[in-house]
Structure formats: structure tokens, C-alpha cells
């Protein structure tokens, strides 16, 4: 019993020591600078002001920093031992029961769970520079906020308010909280523990919310998998994430994710459980059975904000997907600080056309948690389904990708449906043609059309605010989100570019991820020396700090040694009356090295223009002749990511 708890039982890594050690030591150390006698005078404001310099308790530090009390105790003890050469024992003595020992509350130390090696490796990936972590904590950007805490707050303060809404089906915050706790208990009975990864492949339905909140209830990590992915992607992502369970759809019409996961289990050494929503194939568990689990199962662990709680993968439009570990410090602080700047409160109703398996959709999910507002659910996007959902469900805020707006416009739905409930809408995921945003703002006069720039690695990095006006919002992706710093730099030298000049967009802030999981090569080039994340996006910043996205570094076309960005060509082609969407990318050329090829998807019923006609259209808009596309491909439908971004690597090759 006297052996206490060791590092594997507490979940402390050397990387965590490096990030939080100095912060914990400084907050715990008594600096003896007490002034006056506020305690005798009962001057509560002065007492609070003196609290930190006088030294905080481990519990107070845990609440401030976003760690568990035991983690703070361990880190403090080890830091004092290293700094002051004290003889403190590095194991923690945990007798249970608080002030008095109680046999029924005591768990023998050998019976405490231990974080798995995979869980510790994932925790070690959450490695932030100590000076940045200290800055974020001191400014209140990072605090001990978790999905479970927000869920319990909403259930206590707004028990009967809607949390997740489908036509004909509404779950209140109390129902979600109670159901998530039961499912968490069922997962705990299956042997899942803090730090274990659980893959979730579900559409935007209430079961996604239940699974997500249940896994993170006890400190598990949610790994999202997009709905279009099949066996090959499933095997790759579950293997890399080392997932111990997957929650997915059961028996389907043309494909069963649950059956595919069962069939792949021999090639997935960490996958122990397949949990199906709907009809479960033989060998799979049913989510309904977990929902019916014993509500009194005791889970002896509550997560903290520093714990990893998401494992996402980049969309892989130009390369293989990369694993992105994220915690509540990143995601929930970003949502909490962004909500008031968007004017969002508990009285709003948000609908996202983007899937919850993508960070853009999760941004709406997180905003719902931190504000207490309802998420209106669209399980699968089609232009009519989105337009009808807005008309019938009456959201006040809607998340679009530019392709969603283009598809609804091409289908003639903008003038046919009632969009008057929207007070603000957001466009993100790819570059939005300014002409389309101006047209939508004119069609929706009571709604403020805004843009957002984000990535899997950082959620919402920049956005325009509702008060910025369409003049800014149609052209610019936004200005820095709260707490972040954005700059535009030379991609090769790293020197900051003057206002108005194009360069790489780089960002630093409390929402930025710490680095890719098990990908040393990618991490070597992901950050600058002063820890700005290199986005790979090109843009320029105006005098007011607004940033316009002009393309991707990898999309630059090098025609005979002359380099140019094709995004302005894409925007103009998308404005052609016959064209719904367009993409321009380089193709090999024997003499020039590269030349531009245009791919277009036509509006319904439109006749395909030839290359000469399109080039004449571009010349009318004073495009330089060397930028004109020299190849043209008409496609029936573009290959798209789950957030409706064109995957240029999968475009068909032009004819010779």
C-alpha cells in the first residue's frame, strides 16, 4: 500500500513535465510577498489577488492549468526534487477517502489501471513549448474545460433544452448526459480506459454525439473516420491510430462498416471491439446494448483539459493523411473564445452541412457544447436536403462549404426556400468565389455572410465577424481568431512579407496542435523556429489585419520558369454561366516543364464550352496570357473530400 501510484498510473510523461513543470512549480511556490493583512480585514478581492503569489494548492493549480490533481502533485514533487534536491518520494500515496480513511473507497495500488504504452505515446505527442503553455494559462486561454464538464453544466442548467435535433427526434441536454454516462459505463466494462483510442464512423446523427461524449467521459480519445471511407482507408487509419474499438453503422444497403471492421480484425492487432449502430452483424456489439447498460457503474477517472481527446487525420488532398492529436485546451478554448465574436449564445440553433467527422463540423459541435445551444442535424448533404432543413428546422447559424453554396445556387434553390431564420452563416473548407458570396448576401439580407479559415491542425484560425460587412467577408477569409497570431511570410526565407504582398500564412496560438503523431519527417517542416505553424496556404494581409487566401504552395504552376497561382483563374472560370465549379492544376509538358489544365463541372443543362471560348472569357477579364489554361477536361462530378473540397490529386488526366 505504501508503494503509491507510479507515472503510468497517473499518466505523466516527460513531455508533460517539460510543458507544465515550470508553470506548476511557480504557481505552487510561496514567494512570501504578502502585503498588509487582507485576511483579518476580510478583503476578499485582495485575498484573491494575493492567492497565486502566496502559492496555490494542487487542486487550485489543476483547475487553473487543466491537469488532474494527482498529475499536479506528481509534477510538483518531481520538479521540487530536481530544483531543490529534496528527498520527496516520486510515487504518490493515495489512501482514498479524503480526510478519513474509508475501506470502501480504497483501491489497492496494484489494482489501479495503468495507461497503455499506446496511450502514453499519444500523451507524449501533446508536447507544447513551456513558454507558450505558460502564456496561454496566464491569459486564461487554457483552463480546465472538458466536454464532460460542459455536458454536465448544460444538463444542470438547461436540462430540458434541445441539444441534438433531427426532424421528429429531439434529445435534451439531460437525456444526452444520462445516455452518454451509461454508454461510458458500458465501454468501461469492456475494458476501455483513459487514453485508449475509439474510432467513430457515423453521420451527423444523435448517436455520433452520444459516442463522442461517452468516449471522452472517462478520458478516451475519439478518432473520427469519414463516412465515404471503405475497407482500405479503414484499415490504414485504425492501424495508425491503434484504435481499440470502433463505433460505426451496422448492416447497410451496399456496405456494412461493422462487417468490414470485423473482417479486417486479423489485420488490426489493437482492435478489440466493433460496436454497431442499428442492426449489428454477428460478432459485433450493439450501441443500444451499451445505452441499456447499468447506470450505476462507477468510473474512477475524470479527464482533464490537457488529456488528448481527439485524433483526426488531414484530408490528404495532396498527400497521405497525417494524424493530428488534439486536446480540450486546443478545441474548447477556440470555441469558447470564438462564440461571443460570432454573437452565438444558448438561444441559437446551429446547423452544419459539414460532417462531424471533420474539424469544421466538429467546430459546430464544440460551439454547441460551450454555449448550450442546439445542434440541428443533417445526416447527409444533398442540395435539396440542406435547403429543406434550413427552411423547416429554422437554424440561426449555418456552416457551409463553398461547394454547398454553389450546388444550391446551380439547382435554383436559393429563391425557392425560406432562409429567413439565419442571422449568420459561415463559409469554409476551400476558397469561396467572391461573386457567389455577394450574390448570397443579396439573397439573404437578414443574414451576415462570413468566411472562416481553418485546418485539421488548428480548427478556426481566422474568421470574419458578422459586423465586418460583405465588402470584407467576400474577399477575405478573416482576421486572427482570439488568442492567435497570424503572419504572412516568404515560404523560402521565412521573412515576414509587407502588407499586401503574397506569402505563406503562418499561425501560432492556443488552438494550434503540438505536432503530427508518429511522423517525425512531417514535424521537421511543420513549424518555424519560433513555433509558427506553416499552413502551406498562400495569401496576403491588408492594413486592417484581414487575410485573403490566394492558393496553396503545392498548387503553384511553374510554366517555363514563370510561376503563378491558379486560384484567380479558378474563381473566374466558376463565374462562367455554364460552369458550376472549376479547378486548375499543373500537368507535365516536355518543353515548359508544366502547363495549366482546367477541369470544369457544368451547371445542370448547360452546354460545355470549348477551351477557346473559356480562354476568351478569361481574356475579357484581363488575365495574363501566360496564365491561360492550355488543356481542358469536363467532368461529370469532381472528386471531393467530406467537406466538399476538390481533391486535385484524383482529377482525370487530360487527353494527349
What is each model feature region?
Residues 172-175, 309-333:
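Conserved AMP-binding A3 loop
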Residues 110-115, 190, 217-289, 604:
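Structural core segment of the AMP-binding/adenylate-forming
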Residues 479-483, 495-526, 564:
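Conserved ATP/PPi-binding loop(s) of AMP-dependent carboxylate-activating enzymes
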Residues 144, 159-160, 281-282, 292-313, ...:
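Conserved pre-ATP/AMP-binding loop-to-beta segment of ANL
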Residues 142-143, 148, 152, 160-213, ...:
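Conserved AMP-binding/adenylate-forming core of the ANL superfamily
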Residues 219, 332-349, 357-397, 411:
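Conserved AMP-binding/adenylation subdomain of ANL enzymes
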Residues 229-239, 246-250, 398, 509, ...:
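AMP-binding/adenylate-forming catalytic core of the ANL superfamily
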Residues 370, 395-400, 409-472, 485:
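Gly/Ser/Thr-rich phosphate-binding loop
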Amino acid at each position: 500500500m505504501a508503494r503509491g501510484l507510479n507515472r503510468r498510473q497517473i499518466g505523466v510523461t516527460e513531455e508533460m513535465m517539460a510543458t507544465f513543470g515550470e508553470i506548476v512549480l511557480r504557481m505552487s511556490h510561496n514567494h512570501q510577498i504578502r502585503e498588509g493583512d487582507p485576511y483579518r480585514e476580510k478583503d476578499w478581492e485582495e485575498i484573491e489577488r494575493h492567492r497565486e503569489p502566496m502559492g496555490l494548492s494542487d487542486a487550485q493549480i489543476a483547475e487553473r492549468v487543466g491537469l488532474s490533481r494527482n498529475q499536479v502533485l506528481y509534477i510538483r514533487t518531481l520538479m521540487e526534487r530536481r530544483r531543490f534536491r529534496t528527498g520527496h518520494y516520486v510515487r504518490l500515496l493515495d489512501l482514498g477517502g479524503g480526510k478519513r480513511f474509508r475501506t470502501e473507497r480504497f483501491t489497492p495500488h496494484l489494482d489501479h489501471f495503468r495507461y497503455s504504452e499506446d496511450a502514453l505515446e499519444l500523451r507524449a505527442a501533446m508536447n507544447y513549448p513551456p513558454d507558450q503553455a505558460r502564456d496561454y494559462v496566464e491569459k486564461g486561454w487554457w483552463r480546465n474545460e472538458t466536454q464532460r464538464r460542459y455536458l454536465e453544466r448544460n444538463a444542470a442548467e438547461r436540462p430540458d433544452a434541445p441539444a441534438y435535433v433531427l426532424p421528429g427526434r429531439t434529445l435534451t441536454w439531460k437525456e444526452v448526459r444520462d445516455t452518454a454516462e451509461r454508454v461510458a459505463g458500458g465501454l468501461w466494462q469492456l475494458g476501455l480506459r483513459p487514453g485508449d483510442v475509439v474510432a467513430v464512423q457515423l453521420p451527423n446523427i444523435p448517436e455520433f454525439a452520444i459516442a463522442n461524449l461517452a468516449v471522452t467521459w472517462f478520458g478516451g480519445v475519439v478518432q473520427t473516420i469519414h463516412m465515404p471511407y471503405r475497407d482500405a482507408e479503414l484499415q490504414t487509419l485504425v492501424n495508425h491510430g491503434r484504435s481499440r474499438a470502433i463505433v460505426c453503422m451496422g448492416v447497410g444497403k451496399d456496405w456494412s462498416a461493422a462487417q468490414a471492421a470485423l473482417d479486417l480484425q486479423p489485420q488490426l492487432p489493437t482492435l478489440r471491439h466493433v460496436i454497431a449502430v442499428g442492426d449489428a452483424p454477428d460478432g459485433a456489439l450493439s450501441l443500444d446494448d451499451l445505452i441499456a447498460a447499468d447506470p450505476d457503474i462507477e468510473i474512477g477517472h475524470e479527464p482533464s483539459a490537457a488529456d488528448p481527446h481527439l485524433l483526426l487525420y488531414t484530408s490528404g488532398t495532396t498527400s497521405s493523411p497525417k494524424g493530428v492529436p488534439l486536446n480540450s485546451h486546443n478545441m474548447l478554448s477556440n470555441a469558447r473564445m470564438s462564440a461571443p465574436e460570432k454573437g452565438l449564445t444558448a438561444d441559437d440553433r446551429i446547423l452544419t452541412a459539414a460532417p462531424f467527422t471533420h474539424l469544421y463540423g466538429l467546430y459546430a459541435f464544440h460551439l454547441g457544447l460551450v454555449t448550450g445551444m442546439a445542434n440541428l442535424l443533417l445526416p447527409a448533404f444533398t442540395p435539396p436536403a440542406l435547403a429543406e432543413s434550413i427552411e423547416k428546422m429554422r437554424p440561426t447559424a449555418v456552416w457551409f462549404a463553398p461547394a454547398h453554396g454553389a450546388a444550391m445556387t446551380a439547382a435554383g434553390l436559393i429563391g425557392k426556400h425560406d432562409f429567413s431564420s439565419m442571422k449568420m452563416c459561415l463559409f469554409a473548407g476551400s476558397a469561396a468565389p467572391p461573386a457567389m458570396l455577394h450574390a448570397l448576401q443579396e439573397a439573404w439580407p437578414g443574414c451576415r455572410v462570413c468566411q472562416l479559415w481553418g485546418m485539421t491542425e488548428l480548427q478556426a484560425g481566422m474568421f470574419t465577424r458578422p459586423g465586418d460587412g460583405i465588402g470584407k467577408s467576400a474577399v477575405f477569409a478573416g482576421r486572427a481568431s482570439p488568442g492567435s497570431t497570424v503572419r504572412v511570410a516568404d515560404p523560402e526565407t521565412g521573412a515576414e512579407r509587407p502588407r499586401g504582398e503574397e506569402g505563406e500564412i503562418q499561425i501560432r496560438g492556443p488552438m494550434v496542435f503540438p505536432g503530427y503523431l508518429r511522423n517525425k519527417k512531417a514535424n521537421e517542416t511543420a513549424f518555424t523556429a519560433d513555433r509558427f505553424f506553416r499552413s502551406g496556404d498562400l495569401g496576403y494581409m491588408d492594413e486592417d489585419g484581414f487575410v485573403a487566401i490566394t492558393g496553396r504552395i503545392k498548387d503553384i504552376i511553374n510554366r517555363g520558369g514563370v510561376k503563378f497561382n491558379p486560384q484567380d483563374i479558378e474563381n473566374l472560370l466558376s463565374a462562367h454561366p455554364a460552369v458550376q465549379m472549376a479547378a486548375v492544376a499543373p500537368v507535365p509538358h516536355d518543353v515548359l516543364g508544366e502547363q495549366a489544365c482546367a477541369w470544369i463541372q457544368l451547371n445542370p443543362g448547360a452546354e460545355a464550352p470549348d477551351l477557346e471560348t473559356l480562354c476568351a472569357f478569361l481574356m475579357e477579364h484581363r488575365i495574363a496570357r501566360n496564365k491561360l489554361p492550355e488543356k481542358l477536361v469536363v467532368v461529370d462530378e469532381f472528386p471531393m473530400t467530406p467537406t466538399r473540397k476538390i481533391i486535385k490529386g484524383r482529377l482525370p488526366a487530360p487527353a494527349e
